[in-house]
From Swiss-Prot:
PANTHER family given in the database record: GLYCINE DEHYDROGENASE (DECARBOXYLATING), MITOCHONDRIAL (PTHR11773:SF1), GLYCINE DEHYDROGENASE, DECARBOXYLATING (PTHR11773)
Organism the protein comes from: Bacteroides thetaiotaomicron (strain ATCC 29148 / DSM 2079 / JCM 5827 / CCUG 10774 / NCTC 10582 / VPI-5482 / E50)
CC per GO annotation: cytosol; glycine cleavage complex
Function: The glycine cleavage system catalyzes the degradation of glycine. The P protein binds the alpha-amino group of glycine through its pyridoxal phosphate cofactor; CO(2) is released and the remaining methylamine moiety is then transferred to the lipoamide cofactor of the H protein.
Name used for this protein in its record: Glycine dehydrogenase (decarboxylating)
GO-annotated molecular function: glycine binding; glycine dehydrogenase (decarboxylating) activity; pyridoxal phosphate binding
Classification via InterPro entries: GcvP, GDC-P_C, GDC-P_N, GDC_P, PyrdxlP-dep_Trfase, PyrdxlP-dep_Trfase_major, PyrdxlP-dep_Trfase_small
Reaction(s) the record says it catalyses: N(6)-[(R)-lipoyl]-L-lysyl-[glycine-cleavage complex H protein] + glycine + H(+) = N(6)-[(R)-S(8)-aminomethyldihydrolipoyl]-L-lysyl-[glycine-cleavage complex H protein] + CO2
Length: 949
């Protein structure tokens, strides 16, 4: 008998707790609750056919065995992925720290000041290195950033260009191939043509509205693009540049020679390669383009007492507000990796990063000179870290490959027979000597081992950086490990994460990220693998990916899986591109409309637009369900043009709609597909699934249902699962022989995250996963039962129960007292809780999802808190508290306010800070008072250098 299965540690509710909760809900058994919650016609008849669960110890041995199948050769392939050194102080205190990896996107400003500052450091570093005034706080990867640049520049076309139908982007042929593939996927549905050619032969024409360049280019050559950029601007063409962020420590930054957008990846700033991801893409642009910029932007603001603070700025651009009119569908990005990159810049500072870049460049210069002595011809006139060689007549690429592999080295091999390599931060003298030996042996030459490499540069004066960067004091003050550790800790104390308390965000599934699932990520065999190594060197990764894919097929009831999308939004986009490709293959490419319920998350319409579709909104009825009459009418009205329905199940209202099978049948009868948004899959696993219900494709959020962490806004993984007829259209990659529908730079997206979900499924097993779903539903219904008589529950299913989340009614409170759902959210911070989801999907409400991981004690404490806040609301209603000066409208109360000598409120300090006894045991002090949300938008200050003075 196995006694240490993960399920007993992951699920917070035991049998005794269950009995107590069921009595409160008013049902006799857990099965009765589930039977009354989920429609009988969609219940699975058999348990999921998954492997028996492993104990945590057994999984540790299993994952070690898989890791041992990965062969960690020294890899110099480059092409956007490079070995790097993650400072141990960052790995230990950020990457492996649950305070950082279990936090949510920093929408709740007052309990997010730590990671907001960390992300502001990232933005500042990006702006400094690129010499651009504005950067966002990460995108999914470099290739996605390129695609975002294309669509942003398309939106920024002049009126003349729009009238003329300008739709061509010139792309220099020396761009990374994976970047070109992802841009192509994005460009096609937008009607944008990518015209690939030599930048030196570029001739402006009216149909060209933008140009994209790589710096240094894909072969490693550093081109002087200043004249090209001037020529493009004279023709009203914008210029976007994919720039190696580390090279900009030595090279003239694109902002100094006129680039309009600079993008790329910050993987080289201390983030392991992880077999392709995750790492933080970056995106920088001009200030005048800020409202067209994709992704989240951190800016300065002040709290109500004038204290400087940070917040997420210009949110009205984003999909959760603008929906189909959003600048992008980007939602989850790469916050944790951006945080790490920002800390890397803080830890090393300007001189440290210059030293790292100079060392890389010096080794490259040395190898260039030495290999020329062996008879090789180096083709890059100017370079940073990458050399490309034409071989002597008597030497072949295959000879070099054989010798290199015998020394466990991977080089880059070009189609024309050239051989190259990219030097990185980990290249030391021993590695340099191995590289020398490979090329010397192939050429039949003698060579001498070297003891050191002289500091040299081959960069022309015109291309050499002369301007300082990272000049803010934050990049100078924390260069010892002691100071760095304390700085990181000082920031993490400002934030609420799962390490503090339950985060009950509806539609976000903030469940446990178990340590046993997280540990494999720190293994070098998973951290240090380049995504383009030969397949036989990545057998462990490939086996894990294959096993996980099979598990996800079983769980979803589908025939095919792609793990490539780097987020849920990317999954939506990928799934819609698959639908488009399928429809075109059967002569139905004219279908261009997506039907979306009004309750849908904003990413749905934003993704549909990005995938080249038009959206049609379907109404919801008074019970929160899809209005069947309106659905039938809209489906019939758009029958010939309808491509798909996008629907979340259970709905974003937290309800298992009884007509879901009929909904799928109506759509299929129109010749369209059903796209199921898997955001709420945590209420399906083991009990029903999208394939059985009748959907054709769904995406999953591994960072919700499948236990990978949110990381303060990423990394996420959004794999798509599809029915048999859609399998041929899944995203490709050059290593698969086809780049159709490619949506991320790496073949398996953020492969480094996959061991977490793999571990979750392998350790939970069928019974554990199914029980987790049941308990998630139990917990939501328990909270609903506890709070229904005070706040009230907005929507319930046909039999009176909610799904795995519920919407708390706050609109009547506002009508009667002026207290808003936002005031309640801010007051929760004084009790040590992160707010539930505000005003989504119903304005003036709070959506709560407790997940299966919380204990009854935590649920009861949350109920006590909510009921005490209800009492505080009643005090305002009954005029026992001042309507204009009470604990709710003044919340949250930072420590500096509580200890201030000038306490002028009509209530006591104790009522403000310690409203119930449990708060005394685990007090979380907010760092700032309520933040001014308009100030930071009126004057956007996106770097540490900003000032309101």
């Amino acid at each position: 008998m196995k006694t240490d299965l993960l399920a007993s540690r992951h699920i917070g509710i035991n049998e005794e707790d269950t009995a107590v909760m069921l009595r409160k809900i008013g049902v006799d058994s857990l099965d009765e609750l589930i039977n009354k919650t989920i429609p009988a016609n969609i219940r699975l008849k058999e348990p999921l056919a998954l492997a028996k669960p492993l104990t945590e110890y057994e999984f540790g041995k299993h994952i070690a065995d898989l890791a041992s199948k990965n062969k960690l050769y020294t890899t110099y392939i480059g092409l956007g992925w490079y070995n790097t050194i993650t400072p141990a102080v960052i790995q230990r205190n950020v990457f492996e720290n649950p305070v950082w990896y279990t936090s949510y996107t920093p929408y709740q400003t007052e309990v997010s000041q730590g990671r907001l500052e960390a992300l502001m450091n990232f933005q500042t570093a990006v702006c400094d290195l690129t010499a651009m005034p504005l950067a966002n706080c990460s995108l999914l990867d470099e290739a996605t950033a390129a695609a975002e640049a294309v669509t942003m520049m398309y939106a920024l076309r002049s009126r003349t260009q729009q009238k003329a139908g300008a739709n061509v982007v010139f792309v220099d042929e020396n761009i990374f191939p994976q970047t070109l593939a992802v841009m192509t996927t994005r460009a096609i549905p937008q009607g944008i043509e990518l015209r690939v050619g030599k930048y030196k032969e570029f001739e402006p024409s009216p149909e060209i509205f933008a140009c994209i360049l790589q710096y240094p280019n894909s072969s490693g050559n550093v081109e002087d693009y200043a004249d090209f950029t001037k020529k493009a601007h004279e023709a009203d063409c914008k210029v976007a540049v994919a720039a190696d962020i580390l090279s900009l420590a030595l090279l003239t930054p694109p902002g100094e020679w006129g680039a309009d957008i600079v993008f790329g990846t910050t993987q080289r700033l201390g983030t392991p390669m992880f077999y392709g991801g995750p790492s933080a893409g970056y995106f920088a642009t001009r200030d005048e383009y800020k409202r067209n910029m994709p992704g989240r932007i951190i800016g300065w603001s002040k709290d109500k007492y004038g204290k400087l603070c940070y917040r997420m700025a210009l949110q009205t651009r984003e999909q959760h507000i603008k929906r189909e009119k959003a600048t992008s569908n980007i939602c989850t990005a790469q916050a944790l990796l951006a945080t790490m990159a920002g800390f890397y810049a803080v830890y090393h500072g300007q001189e440290g990063i210059k030293t790292i870049a100079s060392r890389i460049h010096s080794i490259t210069v040395f190898l260039d000179k030495q290999l020329k002595k062996f008879g090789y011809t180096q083709v890059n006139a100017q370079y940073f870290d990458t050399l490309r060689f034409e071989l002597p007549e008597h030497v072949s690429a295959q000879q070099i490959r054989t010798i290199a592999l015998s020394k466990e080295v991977n080089l880059r091999y070009y189609e024309n027979g050239d051989v190259g390599f990219s030097i990185d931060e980990t290249t030391d003298i021993a590695a340099t000597n191995v590289l020398l030996s490979i090329f010397a042996i192939a050429a039949g030459k003698d060579y001498q081992k070297v003891e050191d490499v002289p500091e040299k540069s081959n960069i022309d004066k015109a291309l050499k950086r002369t301007t300082p960067f990272l000049t803010h004091e934050v990049f100078s003050n924390y260069h010892t490990e002691t100071e760095m550790m304390r700085y990181i800790k000082r920031l993490d104390r400002k934030d609420i994460s799962l390490a503090q308390s339950m985060i009950s965000l509806g539609s976000c599934t903030m469940k446990l990220n178990a340590a046993a699932e997280m540990l494999p990520l720190s293994r070098p065999e998973f951290m240090s693998m380049h995504p383009l190594v030969p397949e036989d060197q990545a057998e462990g990764y490939r086996e894990l990916i294959s096993n996980l894919s099979e598990d996800l097929k079983v769980i979803t009831g589908f025939a095919g899986v792609s793990l490539q999308p780097n987020s849920g939004a990317a999954g939506e986009y990928a799934g819609l591109r698959v639908i488009r490709a399928y429809l075109e293959s059967i002569g139905q490419g004219h279908r261009n409309k997506i039907l979306i319920p009004a309750s849908a998350h904003g990413t749905n319409p934003a993704s549909a637009i990005q995938a080249g579709f038009e959206t049609v909104t379907c109404a919801c009825d008074e019970q929160g369900n899809v209005d069947m009459g309106d659905l039938r009418a809209k489906a019939e009205e758009n029958k010939e043009a309808l491509a798909a329905l996008m629907i979340t199940y259970p709905s974003t209202h937290g309800i298992f709609e009884t007509e879901i099978k009929e909904i799928c049948e109506i759509i299929h009868a129109c010749g369209a597909q059903v796209y199921m948004d898997g955001a709420n899959m945590n209420a399906q696993v083991g009990l029903t699934n999208p394939g059985f219900i009748g959907a054709d494709v769904c995406h999953l959020n591994l960072h919700k249902t499948f236990a990978s962490p949110h990381g303060g806004g990423g990394p996420g993984v959004g794999p798509i699962c599809v029915a048999e007829h859609l399998v041929p259209f899944l995203p490709g990659h050059s290593i698969f022989g086809s780049t159709q529908n490619q949506v991320s730079a790496a073949p398996f997206g953020s492969a480094g995250i996959l061991p977490i979900t793999y571990g979750y499924i392998r350790m939970m097993g069928t019974e554990g996963l199914t029980q987790a779903t049941k308990i998630a539903i139990l917990n939501a219904n328990y909270l609903a039962a506890c709070l229904k008589d005070t706040y009230g529950i907005v929507y319930r299913g046909a039999t009176g129960f909610v799904g795995h989340e519920m919407i708390l009614e706050c609109r009547k409170v506002h009508e009667e007292t002026g207290i808003s759902e936002n005031d309640i959210a801010k007051r929760l911070m004084d009790y040590g809780y992160h707010a539930p989801t505000l005003s989504f999907p119903v304005h003036g409400t709070l959506m709560i999802e407790p997940t299966e991981s919380e204990s009854l004690a935590e649920l009861d404490n949350f109920v006590d808190v909510m009921l005490n806040i209800w009492k505080e609301i009643q005090e305002v209603k009954n005029e026992e508290a001042d309507k204009n000066d009470n604990v709710l409208i003044n919340a949250p109360h930072p420590e500096y306010e509580i200890v201030n000598d000038n306490w002028e409120h009509s209530y006591t300090r104790e009522k403000a800070a310690y409203p119930i006894e449990s708060v005394r045991e685990n007090k979380f002090w907010v760092n700032v008072a309520r933040v001014d949300n308009t100030l930071g938008d009126r004057k956007l200050l996106p770097t540490r250098y900003g000032t309101f003075e």
